């Protein structure tokens, strides 16, 4: 009957947020003061629609298919695309500063946080994606290495 701490990083797991973490959380909530949730949702839909339009225009030839609903009103603040080489493509995007998500077997997912994602961010991300696809940068073997977190 004695305490035996977990090994490795698991020793630092805690189920109760610290006072410092809660104060940071409270400050984060202040971001929403005076913000209309309808405005946030409208921008979210506009960001996603712009992304989808640009991807279809600039990357349509590269084998992407839409996995999310096409209508903005029917989807959340993200767009999911399928591609046979989705994992490698997402790793190349991350390496080039575009942070998205991969879900097996072939889904690349892009989230749009309207409070701090700009329309310019969308243009830049799609330009990077088009460059990666056009030049075949995703084919570099380093992008095939899998880790626990994608």
Predicted segments, located by residue:
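A short glycine-threonine-serine/GTX helix/turn-capping micro-motif
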Residues: 1-19
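Conserved small-domain helix->loop->beta segment predominantly found in fold-type I
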Residues: 8-14, 32-82
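Well-ordered alpha-helical segments within folded domains of soluble proteins
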Residues: 19-27
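Short alpha-helical functional segments enriched in proximate histidine and acidic residues
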Residues: 28-31, 54, 132, 136
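Helix N-cap motif at beta-to-alpha junctions
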Residues: 82-87, 116-119
